[in-house]
Amino acid sequence: HSFVYEKLFSLWNTILYVCLIWTLTVVATVPNFFVGSLEYDPRIYSCTFVQTVSSSYTITVVVIHFILPITVVTFCYLRIWILVIQVRRKVKSEFKPRMKQSDFRNFLTMFVVFVIFAFCWAPLNFIGLAVSINPTEVAPKIPEWLFVVSYF
């Protein structure tokens, strides 16, 4: 694996990865300026994405930045879990060397990070979806404490 790692994370590739991340960040942020959805919110003492500016834009942001990635990663983890279960069953029946404990521990750690990510970002995104349904009616009904907690 060290040869693959050295090829994937060479100096040139690492510079490209950093540039790609910054480009994607700019591409994700620029539409906010055209929609006018960035405003100072005194509840969280920060400039943030205002979910009541445009329902269709809020839905698009939530789908592209939360629901789609969560769906793809969930699908991938389900496939990995199925593979792990199949390998464990096969190993037990054939008495072959089992899966490395460190590989399984690494997989489990990444899975926990994903679950924590989803758990932390879900409230804000679900509030955004709820607000986008009917901003004038739903937004005032969301308790301020819930909105503030969803940011932290």
Swiss-Prot record:
TM helices/strands, residue ranges: 13-33, 58-78, 111-131, 145-152
Gene3D superfamilies: Rhodopsin 7-helix transmembrane proteins (1.20.1070.10)
Record InterPro entries: GPCR_Rhodpsn, GPCR_Rhodpsn_7TM, Melatonin_rcpt
A Gene Ontology BP annotation from the UniProt entry: G protein-coupled receptor signaling pathway
Sequence ranges on the Extracellular membrane side: 34-57, 132-144
Keyword hit for Cell membrane: yes
Compartment(s) where it occurs, according to its Swiss-Prot or TrEMBL record: Cell membrane
Residue intervals on the Cytoplasmic side: 1-12, 79-110
Membrane protein topology class: Multi-pass membrane protein
One cellular component term from this protein's GO annotations in UniProt: plasma membrane
Keywords of this entry: Cell membrane, G-protein coupled receptor, Membrane, Receptor, Transducer, Transmembrane, Transmembrane helix
Gene Ontology molecular functions: G protein-coupled receptor activity; melatonin receptor activity
Family recorded in the similarity comment: Belongs to the G-protein coupled receptor 1 family.
PANTHER family membership: B2 BRADYKININ RECEPTOR/ANGIOTENSIN II RECEPTOR, MELATONIN RECEPTOR TYPE 1B
Function, in words: High affinity receptor for melatonin. The activity of this receptor is mediated by pertussis toxin sensitive G proteins that inhibits adenylate cyclase activity.
Name this polypeptide is given: Melatonin receptor type 1B
Organism in which the protein naturally occurs: Xenopus laevis
Top-level taxonomy: Eukaryota, Metazoa, Chordata, Craniata, Vertebrata
Gene name as annotated: mtnr1b
